[in-house]
């Protein structure tokens, strides 16, 4: 399966789906538009992709348990920007599904997908790039195997992009690949 952590065009995600012919799960980044326009028409989401925002899902082929939250911390009233309180609300709303996963599958979550990073992990000091405090709590409480995020663009190989928190690998997917 393929996972997108936001700020990629719907047309690009559709290209990946059609080229690889495998499921693509995504969340939107802070730069996502409400509607994208292109030669194939307008759309509110990528055709064939699975939106993870505020959802907990099980991939039928791999059995992986995924959950996601879109956007970043609010800094200019963009449509995919939220306050810390709003992020807390979204995280807390995932709890019933995570508990049900534990009953059904013996684990809460395998992969937590977000655009923004957790607070104090891979984030930056400016408001637009600060991490989300509720994500730290989710990681510590439900211990997914991975938390993958985008948003923090990495231009130098010396920047830390992988961090272990308890049993969770936190991975910045915007890193340079050497």
Regions found by a protein language model. Name each.
Residues 56-62, 138-142, 155-178:
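Binuclear metal-dependent phosphoesterase catalytic core
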Residues 15, 28-34, 38-130:
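Conserved catalytic scaffold of divalent metal-dependent phosphoesterases
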Residues 12-19, 39, 134, 138:
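A short acidic, amphipathic alpha-helical/loop segment
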Residues 20-29, 130-135:
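A short, gly/pro- and small-residue-rich
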Residues 10-14, 155-157:
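Short, well-ordered alpha-helical microsegments
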Residues 2-7, 24-30, 52, 111-115, ...:
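Active-site neighborhood of phospho(di)ester-bond hydrolases with catalytic His/Asp-centered motifs
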Residues 19-20, 47, 165-168:
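Short, structured coil segments at secondary-structure junctions
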């Amino acid at each position: 399966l393929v996972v997108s952590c936001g700020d990629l065009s719907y047309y690009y995600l559709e290209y990946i789906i059609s080229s690889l012919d495998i499921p693509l799960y995504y969340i939107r980044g802070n730069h996502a538009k409400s509607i994208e326009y292109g030669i194939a028409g307008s759309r509110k989401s990528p055709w064939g992709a699975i939106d993870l925002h505020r959802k907990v899902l099980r991939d039928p082929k791999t059995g992986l348990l995924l959950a996601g939250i879109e956007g970043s911390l609010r800094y200019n009233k963009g449509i995919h920007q939220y306050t810390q309180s709003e992020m807390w609300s979204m995280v807390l709303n995932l709890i019933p599904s995570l508990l049900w996963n534990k009953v059904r599958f013996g684990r809460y979550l395998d992969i937590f997908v977000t655009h923004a990073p957790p607070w104090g992990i891979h984030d930056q000091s400016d408001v637009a790039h600060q991490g989300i405090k509720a994500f730290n709590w989710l990681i510590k409480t439900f211990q997914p195997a991975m938390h993958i995020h985008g948003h923090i663009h990495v231009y130098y190989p010396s920047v830390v992009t992988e961090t272990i928190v308890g049993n969770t690998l936190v991975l910045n997917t915007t890193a340079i690949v050497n």
